[in-house]
Amino acid sequence: MPRSLKKGPFVDEHLLNKVDAQNEKGTKQVIKTWSRRSTILPDFIGHTFAVHDGRKHVPVFIDDSMVGHKLGEFAPTKTFKGHVKDDMKGRR
C-alpha cells in the first residue's frame, strides 16, 4: 500500500538540509547517508549520494528517472554469486 498523498513523500530532514545547502553554494559533493528510506525528490537530480548497504557506501548518481523511488533501491544489500551448477558429476 503506497503512502497517502496528503502526507507527502518522506525525506530525512538532515538529508534535505545537506542538499539545500549544496544547491545554494552550487557545489556537487558526494553526500554520505545511511537513510535508505528517504524518497528521491526533484531537488536531488544531479547530486551523488553515498548510500550505505550495510557494509560500505555505494555511490548513486541521481537522474530524473529515479524521482519518486527510495535511495535504498539503488544500493543492493545482498551480493548474488550465482546459482550452483545442477550437474550430476558433482553428486557421485
From Swiss-Prot:
UniProt-listed GO biological process terms: ribosomal small subunit assembly; translation
* Protein keywords: Ribonucleoprotein, Ribosomal protein, RNA-binding, rRNA-binding
Q: What do the Gene Ontology cellular component annotations say?
A: cytoplasm; small ribosomal subunit
Gene Ontology MF annotations: rRNA binding; structural constituent of ribosome
- Superkingdom as given in the UniProt entry: Bacteria
What InterPro entries does UniProt report for this protein, alphabetically? Ribosomal_uS19 (IPR002222), Ribosomal_uS19_bac-type (IPR005732), Ribosomal_uS19_CS (IPR020934), Ribosomal_uS19_SF (IPR023575)
Q: Does the record bear Ligase in its keywords? A: no
Q: What does this protein do?
A: Protein S19 forms a complex with S13 that binds strongly to the 16S ribosomal RNA.
Family assignment from sequence similarity: Belongs to the universal ribosomal protein uS19 family.
UniProt-listed PANTHER family = RIBOSOMAL PROTEIN S19P FAMILY MEMBER (PTHR11880), SMALL RIBOSOMAL SUBUNIT PROTEIN US19M (PTHR11880:SF8)
Q: Which NCBIfam families match?
A: rpsS_bact
Its recorded name reads Small ribosomal subunit protein uS19
The species this protein belongs to is Corynebacterium urealyticum (strain ATCC 43042 / DSM 7109)
